Every structure is written in C-alpha cells, then in structure tokens.
Regions:
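Condensing-enzyme catalytic core mediating Claisen C-C bond formation in acyl metabolism
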Residues: 1-67, 180-216
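Acyl-thioester C-C bond-transforming condensing/cleaving domain
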Residues: 2-6, 78-89, 103-106, 110-216
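Short, well-ordered amphipathic alpha-helical segments that serve as non-catalytic structural scaffolds
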Residues: 38-48, 68-84, 108-109
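Interfacial helix-loop-helix linkers and transmembrane-helix boundary segments
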Residues: 61, 88-91
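Short, surface-exposed alpha-helical recognition segments that flank or form part
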Residues: 64-71, 129
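Short glycine-rich or small-residue beta-strand-to-loop segments that form or flank ligand, phosphate
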Residues: 92-99
Length: 216
C-alpha cells in the first residue's frame, strides 16, 4: 500500500474583532445590569483575583445587543483580507468554533458564511464545546490541508457570552429566594462568570504554502 504524503500547514495571517469600546471594571454593571437592582458583592473579589481591568461587550449600556456572534466572527474573517480583499475568494473551508452560537439551527458556521457572500460556495463546519471549540475548528482546518483535501482554510474562535450574563437572566432565581425569605443574592459560583467572560472573535488563515515574506 502506498503511504500517504502529508503536507505542511502554515498559519499565514491572524486577525481579531472586539465589539465597541473597552468596558472598565467600574462600568460593567451598567452594561450587564444590576441583579435585584443591587451592586454585586462578589464583583470586586473576583476582579481583584483575576487581574482583568477591562473587557468588550457586544452590548450598549442598558443591555441592548449591538452584534451577533456570527457578525463578530465575519468581521474577524474580513480583517484577514483588509489589504487583499479578493483573496477571500480563494478560501476553500470555513471552520468556525464557538460555545455560544446565536441559535442551534442554522449552525454558527453557516450563519458566519452568510455574512461573507464574497467567499462563494465552500465547505463550512461548526465545532462546539466549552473552551475547546476554537481549537477543534483549528484542528479541522489543519487536517484538511495536511491531508491534501484543500490548500487554504480559515479557522475561527468566537464567543458572545454577555447576553447570557445580563441581570434579567438571574431575576427569576432572585425572586424565588425573596419568596422563601432567604438572602436574595445569587450564589458566588453562579455569579463568578459574570466578571470573567467577555465577547470577541479571532480568525486564522491557514495555507499549505508559506508566505513569501513575513511570519509563518
């Protein structure tokens, strides 16, 4: 049996998109909202320990959404081709990983592809899974080039967690605690992620051919 020849794979370009202006620690609840109309007791503890000083939200103050996950991802992909816009037409695979798609169907990758009409009819995949979704997307693109199925791919990782962290998502639980005459504060474990996560997207351009100049 003839042994398969495996190709080299190179990351030839990277890009990212972060929505709106950075939000400082002091302003976070202006965007996410106040649970039970009260400032968080855990916020300063978490922020002191995680060292984060600002983050990005796909929200306006008051919680109005400004970008979908798919829109952010498409903008990161387009940023790969800022100086060479026609090159997006040569991409043969779009591999988009996320833990927080805008909806279950159509898939996240398909929705991103819908925001990239210039890319044409290409293969699209949508890996999911907390923390590892972006790496799954990267590995799929890597293997497709490695095995010679294609020569050029884009892999993305993106999250839009802010919508799930808004105060209105916690109000039902707070009201039940009040009815039970318990301390109406969400447990530390549940509120912890509100002060850890933010929104954004990144994209890698992968190729079986090295850049003639620059990094690979």
């Amino acid at each position: 049996m003839k042994q398969m020849t495996l190709n080299e794979v190179y990351i030839t370009r990277t890009a990212s998109f972060f929505p709106n202006n950075p939000v400082s620690n002091d302003d976070m609840e202006e965007y996410l909202g106040y649970i039970n109309n009260k400032p968080s007791k855990s916020k300063r503890i978490v922020l002191r320990n995680n060292g984060i000083t600002n983050r990005y939200y796909a929200l306006e103050k008051g919680g109005k959404v400004t970008h979908t996950n798919a829109q952010m991802t498409a903008l990161a992909v387009k940023a790969l081709f800022t100086n060479t816009p026609d090159e997006i037409k040569s991409v043969q695979l779009l591999s988009c990983g996320t833990s927080a798609p805008d909806q279950i169907m159509p898939s996240h990758g398909v929705m991103v592809h819908g925001w990239l009409p210039e890319s044409g009819a290409i293969e699209v995949v949508s890996p999911s899974g907390v923390c590892c979704a972006g790496m799954h997307a990267l590995k799929y693109a890597y293997m497709a080039i490695k095995t010679g199925e294609i020569t050029t791919a884009v892999a993305t990782g993106s999250e839009r967690m802010s919508v799930a962290l808004r105060a209105d998502k916690f109000e039902d639980e707070v009201q039940k605690l009040i009815e039970l005459e318990e301390n109406p504060y969400i447990s530390f474990e549940k509120e912890f992620l509100r002060w850890m996560l933010s929104d954004g997207a990144s994209a890698f351009l992968l190729s079986g051919k090295k850049n003639e100049t620059g990094l690979n």
